[in-house]
Amino acid sequence: MEVDPGSDDVEADRETRAQKLKLKRNVKFRAQMRRFDEYCGVTNLTVDDLNWPLISGIPLQRQRLTGATYYDDSLLDQNPWDEFSIDRFLEITSIQLITAGAGYERNDEITRFVFQRTMKTIVTYCNFMYDLARRNGKVQITRFELQDLIHRDEFRFYMYFRQFLPNPDPNCTAFSNHYTSLLHTLYFNIPGMPQFWNNSQMYNYAATRGQRLVQNIAAFYPPEYFWNEDESKYHTTFVVPRGTEFSKFYARRFHEALGMPPLENEIITVLDWLAKLCILEIVYHTTIWCDITGFGGLPRIEHYRLAMENVEDIIFDLAIDDFSISRLQLQISPFEISRYSPLDVSGYYETIKRKKDIEEYQNRFYEVHYSDDVRIMNVYATDCSRKR
């Protein structure tokens, strides 16, 4: 039997390519870790907060979550990473706080506190899902662990069902069966769930929050806020920075800021959605805390810190540490009890128009914050086939 003398060269070339690929992955990993260290000054996260090992050369698997395509090259952002600043995430947080009724002008202290609390919460979710994935014999977070997390709250799972409804996938029957099983358990095993699911009263949970937050907007925001027809600010998130389309560049930066959790690629869009819900809940919880304590006005930074002092996870009730009042070392100033009154709008027709604008905004608040379709679903109306 003769051996092809060129076979040794082919094998050597294969080993050379493998070494180059490994070297490329190591260089990329070191760059990601360097950026994570830079982000830590703003996110207040450390490596000790992460349960997953930071190992070089473990790529994320390309698997579908919703029918959207995370690896759509036509939407690739060409921005170089070294031109990105983590302060951009603070700007996005500020936009979300304004639309949630926290205040018309940006407050850097409140923005930083809410952003750090949100990032800590999302990392806690990733730790929970990663530990669950390891118990299931997996090396990364999959959509199964994601649904087990969201299933802890029936209303949030319904929101997830509405916004991330997966398309039928004949190649992933296990996921379809798991998804259907969770829906079945949710529908039949929770008392009153059939009525909640099929009745318009299911919106009351979010409508109550929206109504209270709109009261702040109506009392303290200028009339020009209601006349602005640009609704992109309502859809602005960490991975949709312009409020119009999904950005792979920002999704990668958001993933790096979280400490690069090992997850299926498109789960980053759901984590971004959970981050938006977390910001809304923090604003609402602090507003209600101010109502109970008798403070009449927009919450200040000390109110946010005191309101969130004994609160763990604001959505799924997971344990979150390192946010105690002693660690923050607050300098609390005395509360200023000042009852607010409606804005003085001169002119009958201006008053009528303002009331109408506020009513229309309140009716739209639930839609843009809780039930509006995720913008990326319209962007990713593409073929979901993969090149494995």
Curated annotation (Swiss-Prot):
GO terms for molecular function: protein phosphatase binding. Component of a complex containing fem-1, fem-2 and fem-3. Interacts with fem-1 and fem-2 (via N-terminus). Part of a E3 ubiquitin-protein ligase complex, at least composed of cul-2, elc-1, tra-1, fem-1, fem-2 and fem-3; mediates the ubiquitination and subsequent proteasomal degradation of tra-1. Interacts with tra-1. Interacts with sel-10. Interacts with tra-2. Required for male development. In XO (male) animals, fem-3 directs male differentiation in all tissues. In XX (hermaphrodite) animals, it specifies the first 80 or so germ cells to be sperm. Negatively regulates male development when bound to tra-2. Together with fem-2 associates with the CBC(fem-1) E3 ubiquitin-protein ligase complex which mediates the ubiquitination and subsequent proteasomal degradation of tra-1. The gene is fem-3. Disulfide bonds: none annotated. GO terms for biological process: cell differentiation; male sex determination; male somatic sex determination; masculinization of hermaphroditic germ-line; positive regulation of gene expression; positive regulation of MAP kinase activity; positive regulation of meiotic cell cycle process involved in oocyte maturation; positive regulation of oocyte development. Changing residue 360 to K: In allele E2143. This is Sex-determination protein fem-3. It comes from the Eukaryota. Changing residue 299 to S: In allele Q77. One of its GO terms (cellular component) is protein serine/threonine phosphatase complex. Changing residue 159 to I: In allele E2006. Keywords: Developmental protein, Differentiation, Repeat, Sexual differentiation, Spermatogenesis, Ubl conjugation pathway.
